Every structure is written in structure tokens, then in C-alpha cells.
């Protein structure tokens, strides 16, 4: 199950019915038609639970008995598509939800009453996500929440609602409609709180923390490996120089303070500078050991 599906299942599992949520779903996934008996309303979704949720909402709020139809897509995904259809009281429903325009279509913006009321805004965002929302799996490490809209002004309205909850929402216009999106992990987690998906929020945070911990460990391991590589490289250079000194002039001709360091470096090529300092007969600081090693390298370079 994808993370997006898990979020939607959590929301639908709460069995909350809301007119504002219904308004968002109809606006984003619905279409109005005309028949001999008047207006018809069709709402399309690939989510069977959402289709059932719509059926219950129509019945609960308007005593409308809708019909759930389904067919199989013919594209590569071959998903089952559900259409919740009704030709009962459509005009009354659209008027009550402030959805109908003067041309027997759906209003493209968001009603001011929703924009100005926090609880209405929460419910509307919940419906918008159920209809056309998606969240990239947090395991990917590339955080993105998107809500797609047919109309730019609706996408901007969604962004305004999100911004009222202090979320950094942006809008991107596309060839077919527009998308409102969040890219910060903290904003996505806060959005999940706004729509009441608390379990999904906790799951998102857990995955985020685990991933960041793994990344921190990897960075630490990489840094340690790089430090070891640098230590070995510097050690081998010094050992080669000590061998050169030994062959040409003999280690016994080095100053006494350099002889012990030279012998230790040859005996322990894997030692860090600190380990060399700790192994000297007279304790020395790391900078003191480095100074002596530089002297040895300089002597070798001059031979």
C-alpha cells in the first residue's frame, strides 16, 4: 500500500461526514450533466472506499440515493474506476454547497465562507486531498505533497487555505490545470495533523527520523573512512621517507628526538598521530609529533 493510499484509508476509516469535504470532492472530481429529467451529477474516483463515502454523504445530508458504477481502465494501469451517479435533487445539492455557476457548471473557486472559517477549511482540505491529493513516500527522502486542480484559481484557493495554517504552499500551473504543493517535511506532517491523519503523521515522522539517522551514520562512517585513508596515506609517505633516510644516512644519524618517532612509525604504520604521541617514552602532544614527522620528511626531501 502506498503512503498516499494509507493516508486516505485512515481518513475514510474515521467515518466523518462533512458538507465542506463533500464540496471539495465534487468540485475536484465531479461533473454535471443534463438528462430529460434535469441535472445529473457524476463523481469519479479510483478509490472504492471513497465511492462508498460519497454514497453515504449524499444519503446523510440530502437523502439522495446515488448509484455506484464501475469499469476497468483500458490503459496500462488497468485500475478499476468508480462513478457515483445521481439525478436526484442535484440542483438543490449544488445550491446548498454553493457549487453551481450560472451556466450549469461548477464554480471554479472556493467559497468565501470556507476560506474564512478554520473548521470548514480543514474539512475542505481533507476533501481536496481525498479527491486529488498525493504524498511522495517519505522513504524516498524527497518530500512532496501535491493537490491537483483543474483550474488555477482553485489551486490558488487551496494554497490560501494551507497558508492560513502556516504551511508554505506554492502553486504550479501545468498544461492541464494546476497543482498546489508542499515540499518541506515539517509542512507535510502539519498538513496531516490539519486533516486529522494522526497515525500517518506519526508514521511519516518515524520514517523521516530513521532515514536521517541512517544518513548521519553513513556520513560519520564515510568521514571516519576518509580520516583513516588520510592517516594511512600520510603514514606511508613518512615510512618511505624513513626508509630513504635509513638507506642513505642511517637512522642513528638522526637527532635523538626524531629517532624514536621514526622507529615507532615504522613499527606501527596504522597508528594515528595521537596513538604515536601516547606511545613515546616521553609524552608529547599531537602537534609535537606532527612537528617531528615534518622534520623527518624535510630531511628525506633534502637527501
Curated annotation (Swiss-Prot):
Similarity remark: Belongs to the WhiA family.
Listed HAMAP family: HTH_type_WhiA
Cross-referenced InterPro entries: Homing_endonucl, Sporu_reg_WhiA_N_dom, Sporulation_regulator_WhiA, Sporulation_regulator_WhiA_C, WhiA_LAGLIDADG_dom
Purpose of the protein: Involved in cell division and chromosome segregation.
Signal peptide: none
DNA-binding region: 272-303
Transmembrane regions listed in the UniProt entry: none
Protein name: Probable cell division protein WhiA
GO biological process terms on file: cell division; regulation of sporulation
